[in-house]
Amino acid sequence: MKNIMVRDEVYEKLQKMKKGRESFSDVILRLIEGRKKRGIEILERYAGSLSDSELEKIVMEERRKFRVRSFDS
């Protein structure tokens, strides 16, 4: 088990998202898994109906939306 720190506003939002006796870890995992499923659903919806160049364009647009946070050592 690991400890993480989040801003107060993030804590409050996670607290509101909890269902029943769900832990914060459960909430975060649910959010992550939901995001993965949406990505898979999008790919399945377009599978076979787009040309390779159209699919590549969509993939590149989605990659640009993805933010990576860098950490100073």
Swiss-Prot record:
* Pfam families the UniProt entry points to: VAPB_antitox (PF02697)
Q: Which cysteines are joined by disulfide bonds?
A: none
Q: Which UniProt keywords apply?
A: Toxin-antitoxin system
Is Transmembrane included in the keywords of this UniProt record? no
Q: Which residues cross the membrane?
A: none
Record bears the keyword Signal: no
InterPro entries tied to this protein? Put_antitoxin (IPR003847)
Q: What does this protein do?
A: Possibly the antitoxin component of a type II toxin-antitoxin (TA) system. Its cognate toxin is VapC16 (Potential).
Question: So what family is this one in?
Answer: Belongs to the UPF0330 family.
Protein's name in the database: Putative antitoxin VapB16
